[in-house]
């Protein structure tokens, strides 16, 4: 059970996990903007897989903070 209630916007109800997904997406974009210029992606075998794993890890950390 999350700390946040279901939020209703213009008659559409959004569960709390929706906002956790959006927050983790914003943090993912920031982390990715930092990692790309550093050249970390030159050492990554599969960039799409790395991005997916990074997003999943960030989402897990964000969801653990709010539960």
UniProtKB/Swiss-Prot annotation:
It is found in: Cell membrane. It is a multi-pass membrane protein. Induction: Positively coregulated with aaeA and aaeB by AaeR. InterPro entries: DUF1656. Keywords: Cell membrane, Membrane, Transmembrane, Transmembrane helix. GO terms for cellular component: plasma membrane. The chain crosses the membrane at residues 3-23, 43-63. Pfam families: DUF1656. The keyword Flavoprotein does not apply. Its main location: membrane. Belongs to the AaeX family. This is Protein AaeX. It comes from Escherichia coli (strain 55989 / EAEC).
């Amino acid at each position: 059970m999350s700390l946040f209630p279901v939020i209703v916007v213009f008659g559409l109800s959004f569960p709390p996990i929706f906002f956790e997904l959006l927050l983790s997406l914003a943090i993912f974009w920031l982390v990715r903007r930092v990692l790309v210029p550093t050249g970390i992606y030159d050492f990554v075998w599969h960039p799409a897989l790395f991005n997916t794993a990074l997003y999943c890890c960030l989402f897990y950390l964000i969801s653990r903070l709010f539960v």
